[in-house]
């Protein structure tokens, strides 16, 4: 089979590598960072993560649709992957109804595209089941919560078990990957899963890439479900949100914010205060067994891209075939298998049509 170099060992790179390995290809993963590293340059460990699609349809929704049943099955059959099946409750505030009628995110719709994709989908309007007076209705369904540190290690272990090799180094130019396949031979295809670094990677330098700063708090407190809200109480903080992701180990991720073009890597104490205050105001039961037990404040840079993610085949002069798979913004985990499968299809196209 073909010799492939995958640049990047985040969720996109590892998922794509895994799908290529399952087809019998010889894969070398090249990355400055690998699971276990905690660097602001390595986005994937800082994510929540869950399956909570916010696209209204089209290709981006298709990526999420492909990933849902795979993640659900992993939660059921492979507990070592760190994925938990758990209910997701999206709270739609009464005050947001007018604007939602104009621009309604999929997670707040009464009749979203994914209602027949997920398990146990339900619109809850019965006031006896809605705790908060300012909530118009709930969108509830069976979702997954991914412990990202555990899952990234699981992905890497799966890749290694199928024969992948790993080269831990920074790639400064896309052409350098031609010298890095473990066989010593030039790879047939390079797969670029460099995430936000695609902005700086020589030979790519995608200036459409930009950071979307996120800040969350990891705590040893939990709810029996996951939660999100259509907006926060303060009108002046429109780039902030309230969401709680409940992991299998009893910890929770409480967030957060979506701050485009913010490269800051340091936690903002005032934002941490707002995040926790909102969570406790909405869910005082978080502290039923004791006060909030904070593990750490986390900051990450989601790989945003103008026009959406890039999944495509390119033939670069002097380099060869490159398949790009990056720029999923905040949807990296929930879109991972859909985007990886499309990337694999482009690899196969390059292999079968070398004169493109």
From Swiss-Prot:
In biotechnology, this protein is used as follows:
Capable of converting cephalosporin C (CPC) into 7-beta-(5-carboxy-5-oxopentanamido)-cephalosporinic acid, an initial material of different beta-lactam antibiotics. Has been used to resolve racemic mixtures of D,L-amino acids to yield enantiomerically pure isomers for pharmacological and peptide research uses.
Organism this protein belongs to: Trigonopsis variabilis (Yeast)
- Effect upon mutating residue 108 to S: Decreases activity
Report if keyword Glycoprotein is assigned: yes
Which family would the database say this protein is a member of?
A: Belongs to the DAMOX/DASOX family.
Q: One GO MF term, please?
A: D-amino-acid oxidase activity
Q: Name one Pfam family in it.
A: DAO
Q: EC number(s) of the enzyme?
A: 1.4.3.3
Q: How does activity depend on pH?
A: Optimum pH is around 9. Optimum pH is around 7.5.
Q: Which InterPro entries match?
A: D-amino_acid_oxidase_CS, DAO, FAD-dep_OxRdtase
Binding positions (anthranilate 1): 243, 302
**Which residue positions does the secretion signal occupy?**
1-17
Q: Where does FAD bind?
A: 9, 44, 48, 50, 171, 302, 329, 332-334
Q: How is its activity regulated?
A: Inhibited by benzoate and hypochlorite.
Q: What is the effect of changing residue 167 to A?
A: Loss of activity
Glycosylation positions in this chain: 192, 262
What is the name attached to this protein's record?
Answer: D-amino-acid oxidase
Main localisation: other
Where is (R)-lactate annotated to bind? 243, 302
Q: Name one GO cellular component term.
A: peroxisomal matrix
Which GO BP annotation is one of this protein's? D-amino acid catabolic process
User: Where in the cell?
Assistant: Peroxisome matrix
Impact of changing residue 258 to Y on the protein? Inactive with D-valine and D-tyrosine
Sorted alphabetically, which keywords does the UniProt record give? Answer: FAD, Flavoprotein, Glycoprotein, Oxidoreductase, Peroxisome, Signal
Q: What does this protein do?
A: Catalyzes the oxidative deamination of D-amino acids with broad substrate specificity. Enables the organism to utilize D-amino acids as a source of nutrients.
Q: Which reaction does it catalyse?
A: a D-alpha-amino acid + O2 + H2O = a 2-oxocarboxylate + H2O2 + NH4(+); D-alanine + O2 + H2O = pyruvate + H2O2 + NH4(+); D-serine + O2 + H2O = 3-hydroxypyruvate + H2O2 + NH4(+); D-phenylalanine + O2 + H2O = 3-phenylpyruvate + H2O2 + NH4(+)
Q: What is the lineage of its organism?
A: Eukaryota, Fungi, Dikarya, Ascomycota, Saccharomycotina
């Amino acid at each position: 089979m073909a010799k492939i170099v995958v640049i990047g060992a985040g969720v996109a790179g590892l998922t794509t590598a895994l799908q290529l390995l399952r087809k019998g290809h010889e894969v070398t993963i090249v990355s400055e960072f690998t699971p276990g590293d905690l660097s602001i340059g390595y986005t994937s460990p800082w994510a929540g993560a869950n399956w909570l699609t916010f696209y209204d349809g089209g290709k981006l929704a298709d990526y999420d649709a492909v990933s849902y049943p795979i993640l659900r099955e992993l939660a059921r059959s492979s507990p070592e992957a760190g994925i938990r099946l758990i209910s997701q409750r999206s709270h739609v505030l009464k005050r947001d109804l007018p604007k939602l009628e104009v621009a309604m995110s999929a997670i707040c719709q009464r009749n979203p595209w994914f209602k027949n994709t997920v398990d146990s989908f339900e619109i809850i309007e019965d006031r006896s089941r809605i705790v908060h007076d300012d909530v118009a209705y709930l969108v509830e369904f069976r979702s997954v919560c991914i412990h990202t540190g555990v899952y990234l290690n699981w992905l890497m272990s799966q890749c290694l078990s199928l024969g992948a090799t790993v080269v831990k180094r920074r790639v400064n130019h896309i052409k350098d990957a031609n010298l890095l396949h473990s066989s010593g031979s030039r790879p047939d295809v390079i797969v670029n899963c460099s995430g936000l670094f695609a902005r700086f990677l020589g030979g790519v330098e995608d200036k459409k890439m930009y950071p979307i700063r996120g800040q969350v708090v990891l705590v040893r407190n939990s709810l029996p479900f996951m939660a999100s809200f259509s907006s926060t109480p303060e009108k002046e903080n429109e780039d902030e949100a309230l969401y709680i992701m409940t992991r299998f180990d009893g910890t929770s991720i409480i967030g957060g914010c979506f701050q485009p073009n913010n490269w800051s890597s340091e936690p903002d104490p005032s934002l941490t205060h707002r995040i926790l205050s909102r969570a406790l105001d909405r869910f005082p039961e978080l502290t039923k067994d004791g006060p909030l037990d904070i593990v750490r404040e986390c900051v990450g840079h989601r790989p945003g891209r103008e026009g959406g993610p890039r999944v495509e085949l390119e033939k670069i002069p002097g380099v060869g075939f490159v398949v790009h798979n990056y720029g999923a913004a905040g949807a990296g985990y929930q879109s991972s298998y859909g985007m990886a499968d499309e990337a694999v299809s482009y690899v196969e196209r390059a292999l079968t049509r070398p004169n493109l």
